[in-house]
Amino acid sequence: MIALIQRVSRASVTVDGEITGAIDQGLLVLLGVEQHDDRTKLEKLAHKVMNYRVFSDENGKMNLNVSQVGGSLLVVSQFTLAADTGRGLRPSFSGAGTPEQAERLYDEFVAHCRAQGVPTQTGRFAADMKVELLNDGPVTFHLQV
């Protein structure tokens, strides 16, 4: 399971002209599911996302997590993160989870984050989405479990 997280001042996702999720300060989480992902990997990645210290403390050091700054998550499904780009000029998605598996784990990831008390907004699974963000930094990390 892969999460590309970006520290944002604000972010939103729009589907068919309708905003489905929007946050102010927090993390935009692009979430990719791979074939062998399961609940254990989901919980490990969710814990890492929610506790990753990417926000600055009073000394300017990245030492605070999203909850400590009163931030939110915007979680967007992104199967292209599971692409194999090692050969050729066209990505292969053979390692990506099935749509059914990916949707189930995406929904569980969102529910897990919400259950931990982190305000969490979403896009719409498998939809053509328009994502807008104001990247703060920029600060971007690729997390994989």
Swiss-Prot record:
Its main location: cytoplasm. Gene3D superfamilies: D-tyrosyl-tRNA(Tyr) deacylase. InterPro entries: Daa-tRNA_deacyls_DTD, DTD-like_sf. It catalyses: glycyl-tRNA(Ala) + H2O = tRNA(Ala) + glycine + H(+); a D-aminoacyl-tRNA + H2O = a tRNA + a D-alpha-amino acid + H(+). It is an enzyme of class 3 (hydrolase). GO terms for biological process: D-amino acid catabolic process. Keywords: Cytoplasm, Hydrolase, RNA-binding, tRNA-binding. The keyword NADP does not apply. It comes from the Bacteria. A motif (Gly-cisPro motif, important for rejection of L-amino acids) lies at residues 137-138. GO terms for cellular component: cytoplasm. One of its GO terms (molecular function) is Gly-tRNA(Ala) deacylase activity. Homodimer. An aminoacyl-tRNA editing enzyme that deacylates mischarged D-aminoacyl-tRNAs. Also deacylates mischarged glycyl-tRNA(Ala), protecting cells against glycine mischarging by AlaRS. Acts via tRNA-based rather than protein-based catalysis; rejects L-amino acids rather than detecting D-amino acids in the active site. By recycling D-aminoacyl-tRNA to D-amino acids and free tRNA molecules, this enzyme counteracts the toxicity associated with the formation of D-aminoacyl-tRNA entities in vivo and helps enforce protein L-homochirality. Belongs to the DTD family. A Gly-cisPro motif from one monomer fits into the active site of the other monomer to allow specific chiral rejection of L-amino acids. This is D-aminoacyl-tRNA deacylase. It comes from Shewanella amazonensis (strain ATCC BAA-1098 / SB2B). The gene is dtd.
